[in-house]
């Protein structure tokens, strides 16, 4: 075999090897993404004490009715599925009863409430309920809560990748921080964050509302602190 033929054989084998590596790399990428999503879906929503850290600030002209400021009760509801909270928010009678302390809480894992006064700021540490994946914040503005008075948030997960070539992913629920501002007639700002510097954090299926910061994320967005 002359040098030219030998060169052609080596070149052809090199090209074949390159194609195999590219195909293998693509397959690995897809498999890695699937492992990542699987880790998110299989994360166990365990109970955690003080895992929801809520900072609420009310303006002095809070919940104005007949030109007078009023108190405003905040309900904090936790559920396993978002549709369970959506169903609650779509039922004005049930909401009214919950604010009155007489409503049933079927499918709601935990319900907390706090009465905010005009001009008040408060920090609350709330336990994360076992099986909870979503939280709803409902402000009791007059005459009744609507979509400008509510926020539904997914509880955050921290992702970690293990290994390099055949990597594995793990995900665990982590504490979250929420800053809520109650305006004259509606919630005017809601920021949420989680994790520490360098963490990869996701809020699965999160919907962004007007008034949230860019740090809040969007559908399955990744936050790097």
What are these regions (language model features)?
Residues 73, 77-147:
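Structured domain cores in non-transmembrane regions
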Residues 22-25:
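C-terminal motif of bacterial Sec signal peptides marking the signal peptidase cleavage site
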Residues 2-15:
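Bacterial N-terminal signal peptides that target proteins for export
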Residues 150-225:
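Glycine-rich, aromatic-bearing surface loops/beta-hairpins
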Residues 27-30:
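Bacterial signal peptide processing site
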Residues 35-57:
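Post-signal peptide N-terminal segment of mature Sec-exported envelope proteins
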Residues 43-47, 61-69:
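Short, solvent-exposed beta-strand/turn "edge" segments of beta-rich domains on protein surfaces
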Residues 54-65, 81:
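Short amphipathic, basic-aromatic surface patches that mediate peripheral association
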């Amino acid at each position: 075999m002359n040098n030219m033929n030998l060169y052609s054989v080596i070149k052809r084998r090199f090209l074949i090897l390159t194609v195999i590596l590219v195909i293998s790399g693509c397959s690995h990428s897809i498999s890695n993404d699937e492992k990542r999503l699987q880790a998110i879906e299989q994360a166990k929503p365990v109970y955690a004490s003080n895992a929801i850290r809520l900072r609420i600030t009310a303006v002095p002209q809070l919940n104005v009715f007949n030109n007078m400021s009023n108190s405003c009760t905040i309900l904090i509801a936790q559920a396993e599925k978002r549709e369970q909270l959506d169903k609650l928010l779509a039922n004005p009678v049930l909401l009214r009863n919950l604010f009155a302390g007489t409503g049933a809480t079927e499918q709601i894992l935990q319900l907390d409430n706090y009465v905010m006064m005009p001009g008040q700021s408060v920090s609350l540490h709330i336990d994360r309920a076992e099986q909870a994946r979503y939280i709803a914040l409902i402000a009791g503005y007059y005459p009744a809560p609507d979509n400008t008075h509510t926020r539904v948030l997914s509880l955050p997960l921290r992702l970690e990748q293990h290994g390099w070539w055949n990597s594995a992913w793990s995900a665990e629920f982590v504490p979250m921080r929420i800053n809520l501002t109650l305006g004259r007639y509606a919630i005017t700002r809601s920021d949420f964050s989680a994790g520490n510097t360098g963490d990869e954090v996701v809020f699965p299926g999160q919907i962004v509302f007007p008034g949230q910061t860019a740090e809040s994320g969007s559908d399955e967005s990744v936050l790097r602190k």
